Amino acid sequence: VNIGDPVPALDPLTGLISVPANTPASNYTITYEICETLNPTNCDQAIATIGVIAAPIVAVDDAPAAVNGGTGNPSLINACTNDTLNGSPVNVADITATIVTPASNPNVALDPATGTVSVAPGTPAGTYTITYEICENLNPANCDQAIVTAVVNAGTIVADDDSVSGINGTSGGAGVLDVLPGDTLNGNPATLGGGGNVTMNVVTPAAP
């Protein structure tokens, strides 16, 4: 509790104690005195104790739909959307989020300021988890943790069949067929060599 924070107050005209909204969790005491109207010096004092608890905070695990690692997704999910404070969706202005355990690959990240989970293009396929914690700003010790599980799939790769005919076997020929045209990775042409997006291996060579 800090100076200037709301605190419970006793109305001496009614004897009722009120607790303002946004009062930090704590045990508060108010000492009051009652005096006889007929004999104003005939008085006694007592203490009223008011226990104020923090609002329930719940961070819920998230498992968004799988994402293509080749293309990524800058806003896969907002991890805070299903988290609640006092039974209502959290307002990021009312909580502070921190990363407890980051993903094993930094390409999969959670922005604590916004709750947004992103997957960068070129992320290897795998299942990545991020453990995060949200704490109420009003009561910084009022916290809960949750886990985001992001499944990253390999890119969509397509190799089309190819054919060529009429090759003179006696003279032969180099480069009689380029098999790459029509092959794609994530909808883009497959390319080899330095800066290429695929590699090529011979699975079954031609046989006599």
Where are the language model's segments positioned?
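Acidic, turn/loop-rich segments in luminal/extracellular domains of secretory-pathway
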Residues: N2-V52, V100-V152, T204-P208
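Surface-exposed or secretory-pathway low-complexity segments enriched in glycine-proline
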Residues: V1-P20, N73-S118, G173-P208
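Extracellular interdomain linkers/hinges and stalk-like, low-complexity segments
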Residues: N27-E33, T37-P89, T127, T131-E133, ...
